[in-house]
């Protein structure tokens, strides 16, 4: 059975880009007779906004979204992540890293998603002394191409060794890294389809590699076009994207429907009616492949 999900981070309030992702993932799930889960990705407390998680859920309800089951909170799922890391440790796929960021980024080259880790701590003889600090844990990546067929973008591939390097699963400050948590959650929740923004396209080969290491299914992926401002920057909390105005719910839903190349939506009394209409008219093949500049 199709199981999709929407996984916001409570580092701020929902904005127009969030609404596009929620609407597209919801329409794809419901049009396929599937479930739509909501998962709160609250892995990084220092960056989170007090009250944002509750505000996000209230906003989704106000826009007519209905999710299946209880909301999952990553902050309550640490035991799952510990079990997942233990499996990788037992398999000899991960190692402790005592490098500071300055240690390994000095002289490092840029790859697909920041600097490529130089592998200094792969060899136990070359690891810096712990100096009483907890290590990060990294996973060894293969020198081979990992690719997949995306439902919107088409073919996408990376050589993890050359483009990314061994990446962190547990940070030295004790917080779980996104890549491990999202793979563990998707597997445990039975997620079969992931519809999300193209900013996460670069993360997908890492997640597929983790899925292979853990022998769990790889979902089908579809990465949505990003909404950008006049300067070409992705609308986000960092670029001061305004929070969704609950007094303009129908107007904002019609706006994201246009971005997704849906037909012109009819008048409706409630946002839920507009979402039902979007489900009935959903066509992934018509979703644009490239970024969309918005006012």
UniProtKB/Swiss-Prot annotation:
GO MF annotation, one: ATP binding
InterPro entries: Glu-Q_tRNA(Asp)_Synthase, Glu/Gln-tRNA-synth, Glu/Gln-tRNA-synth_Ib_cat-dom, GluQ/Sye, Rossmann-like_a/b/a_fold
Cofactor note: Binds 1 zinc ion per subunit.
One GO biological process term: tRNA modification
EC annotation from Swiss-Prot or TrEMBL: 6.1.1.-
Pfam families the record matches: tRNA-synt_1c (PF00749)
Cofactor(s), by name: Zn(2+)
Motif 'HIGH' region, residue range(s) on this chain: 8-18
Residues annotated as binding L-glutamate: 5-9, 41, 178, 196
GO cellular component, one term: cytosol
Binding site for Zn(2+): 97, 99, 117, 121
Keyword annotations: Aminoacyl-tRNA synthetase, ATP-binding, Ligase, Metal-binding, Nucleotide-binding, Zinc
Binding-site positions, ATP: 237
Enzyme superclass (EC): ligase
Motif ('KMSKS' region): 234-238
Function (record text): Catalyzes the tRNA-independent activation of glutamate in presence of ATP and the subsequent transfer of glutamate onto a tRNA(Asp). Glutamate is transferred on the 2-amino-5-(4,5-dihydroxy-2-cyclopenten-1-yl) moiety of the queuosine in the wobble position of the QUC anticodon.
Record NCBIfam families: PRK05710.1-3 (NF004314), queuosine_YadB (TIGR03838)
Family: Belongs to the class-I aminoacyl-tRNA synthetase family. GluQ subfamily.
UniProt-listed HAMAP family: Glu_Q_tRNA_synth
Protein's UniProt name: Glutamyl-Q tRNA(Asp) synthetase
Organism this protein belongs to: Neisseria meningitidis serogroup A / serotype 4A (strain DSM 15465 / Z2491)
The gene coding this protein: gluQ
């Amino acid at each position: 059975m199709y199981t999709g999900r929407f996984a916001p981070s409570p580092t701020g309030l929902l904005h127009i880009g969030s609404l596009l992702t929620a609407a597209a993932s919801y329409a794809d799930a419901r049009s396929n007779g599937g479930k739509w889960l909501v998962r709160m990705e609250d892995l990084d407390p220092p960056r989170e906004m007090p009250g944002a998680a509750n505000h996000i859920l209230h906003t989704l309800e106000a826009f007519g979204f209905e999710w299946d089951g209880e909301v999952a909170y990553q902050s309550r799922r640490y035991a799952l992540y510990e079990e997942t890391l233990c499996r990788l440790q037992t398999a000899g796929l991960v190692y402790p890293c005592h490098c500071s960021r300055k240690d390994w980024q000095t002289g490092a080259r840029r790859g697909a998603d920041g600097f490529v880790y130089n592998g200094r701590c792969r060899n136990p003889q070359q690891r810096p002394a712990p100096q009483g600090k907890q290590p990060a844990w990294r996973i060894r990546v293969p020198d081979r191409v990992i690719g997949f067929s995306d439902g919107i973008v088409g073919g996408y591939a990376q050589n993890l060794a050359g483009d990314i390097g061994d990446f962190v699963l547990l940070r030295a400050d004790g917080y779980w890294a996104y890549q491990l948590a999202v793979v563990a959650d998707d597997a445990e929740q039975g997620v079969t389809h992931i519809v999300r923004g193209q900013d996460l396209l670069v993360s997908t080969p890492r997640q597929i590699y983790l899925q292979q290491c853990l022998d769990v299914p790889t979902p089908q992926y579809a990465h949505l076009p990003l909404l950008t401002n006049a300067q070409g920057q992705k609308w986000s909390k960092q670029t001061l994207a305004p929070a969704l105005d609950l007094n303009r719910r129908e107007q904002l839903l019609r706006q994201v429907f246009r971005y997704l190349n849906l037909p012109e939506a009819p008048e409706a009394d409630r946002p839920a009616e507009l979402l039902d209409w979007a489900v009935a008219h959903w066509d992934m093949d018509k979703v644009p492949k490239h970024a969309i500049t918005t006012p």
